[in-house]
């Protein structure tokens, strides 16, 4: 009963010239218009209906249609805020002419910092074609580090870059420091420092990288055939099994194995070409190559078709 009486007490909006005429509501403009004479009899009408929008690129949701913006559970306010529009009447302003209902707080400084970091993470990921699950894991890692305040003095961009590196390794699609450095504004050394600090702060770890983690991508970027890729993979694995490359990074061993396999085939690649793709210096490739060269006959797969015999391979 109370609800009915309240509704009945509300003033009825009608056209002064045509009280019985139907009113047409313009949802976009927020106007009530007389259907007889076109007079606007009410303005600033609130549309209480749902504002359904379709986001075709929103891969995270099964249904791309939703009301309003996507909720971000990583933010303290859930990324849902209300903006109060400025009034037009004198009652909407104080004696100094300022709006009485200013939006004092639309987003906290911490949420704003995280939003900026999330945008940077997405931009970096897009530039090296990383999937959504990597972005989500990176965002979660950044949130944990940010809330712990354990890396004070380090820039958010550096922390975000290191989190992206960690997320890639945890998801089984590792990227090199140089690859992350290339899509960020942070030096390789600074990313490496943040990487170690984050692992310590979160008391987490990452799987050790192997030569196989990079071989397919490096060979593909170099335009090498499957035969050369399989040979390089076999060479690198045998070199590790025979303990020919103690202390050498898997990336440098992979680069040296690719160099050896390509030089034995008709698809020869220079040290510089391989170094540019792998993100290692020519001298680093040479050092690893010299360690595996003496055992070259034992490293190639039995069915490899040589274009250049083993004894004719570069000795460097």
Swiss-Prot record:
Keywords: Acyltransferase, Chromosome, DNA-binding, Metal-binding, Nucleus, Repeat, Transcription, Transcription regulation, Transferase, Zinc, Zinc-finger
EC number of the protein: 2.3.1.48
Catalysed transformations (reactions): L-lysyl-[protein] + acetyl-CoA = N(6)-acetyl-L-lysyl-[protein] + CoA + H(+)
Domain of life according to the entry: Eukaryota
UniProt binding sites for Zn(2+): 15, 18, 34, 37
Family, similarity comment: Belongs to the TFIIB family.
Domains (record comment): The zinc-binding domain is necessary for the interaction and recruitment of RNA polymerase II to the core promoter, the formation of a fully competent pre-initiation complex (PIC) assembly and basal transcription initiation. The C-terminus is necessary and sufficient for interaction with the TATA box-bound TBP complex and for the formation of PIC.
Protein name: Transcription initiation factor IIB
Organism: Xenopus laevis (African clawed frog)
Name of the gene this protein is made from: gtf2b
């Amino acid at each position: 009963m109370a609800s009915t009486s309240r509704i009945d007490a509300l003033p009825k909006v009608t056209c002064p010239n045509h009280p019985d005429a139907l009113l047409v509501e313009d949802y976009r403009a927020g106007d009530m218009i007389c259907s007889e004479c076109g007079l606007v009899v009410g303005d600033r009408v609130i549309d209480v209906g749902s504002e359904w929008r379709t986001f075709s690129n929103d891969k995270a949701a099964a249904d791309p249609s939703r009301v309003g913006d996507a909720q971000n559970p990583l933010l303290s306010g859930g990324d849902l805020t209300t903006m109060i529009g400025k009034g037009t009447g004198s009652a909407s302003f104080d004696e100094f002419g300022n709006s009485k209902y200013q939006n004092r707080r639309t987003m906290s400084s911490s949420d704003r910092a995280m939003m900026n970091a999330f945008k940077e993470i997405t931009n970096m990921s897009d530039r090296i074609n990383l999937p959504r699950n990597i972005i989500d894991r990176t965002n979660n890692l950044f949130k944990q580090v940010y809330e712990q305040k354990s890396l004070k003095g380090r820039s958010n961009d550096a922390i975000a870059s290191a989190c992206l590196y960690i997320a890639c390794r945890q998801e089984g699609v590792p990227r090199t420091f140089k690859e992350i450095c290339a899509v960020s504004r942070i030096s390789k050394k600074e990313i490496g420092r943040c990487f170690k600090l984050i692992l310590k702060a979160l008391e987490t770890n990452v799987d050790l990288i192997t030569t196989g983690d990079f071989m397919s991508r490096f060979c593909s970027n170099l335009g090498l055939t499957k035969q050369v890729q399989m040979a390089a993979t076999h060479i690198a694995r045998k070199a590790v099994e025979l303990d020919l490359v103690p202390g050498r990074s898997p990336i440098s061993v992979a680069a040296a194995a690719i160099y050896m396999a390509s030089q034995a085939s008709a698809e020869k690649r220079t040290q510089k070409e391989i170094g540019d793709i792998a993100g290692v210096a020519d001298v680093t490739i040479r050092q690893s190559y010299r360690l595996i060269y003496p055992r070259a006959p034992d490293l190639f797969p039995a069915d490899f078709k040589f274009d250049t015999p083993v004894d004719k391979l570069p000795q460097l």
